[in-house]
Amino acid sequence: MARTYKGGCLCGHIRFEAEGPALKPHTCSCTMCQHHSGALTLHWVEFPADKVRWSAKPSVWRSSDYSSRSFCPKCGSTLGAIDDKPVVALVLGSFDSANRRELAPEYHSHAGKRPKWMAR
């Protein structure tokens, strides 16, 4: 049975439901993720686009030739990335409950961009 994950932005204007399984849970420290979020590392989880339902349409900014970063138009909360291929990557910090074993990162992208003083 597929699990449903719920979350949303800081102000509550945008809520989402994503039907699992959660795919490719990972962390990333690339410059784009750092600038998008203001954090040194982001935790991502991917879902097929047709398995993600939004209560309101997030704002997007075209960040590359294959993806757009999504955020709340009212409070600016980072929500994730909407790829041209049918994938939506959501940031785990926007989930209502992130304390699930299946959401633990399986790998880290761009580990070389992580500050040396940052705990592993």
Model-derived features with residue positions:
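A short Gly-Trp-Pro
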Residues: 1-8, 13-120
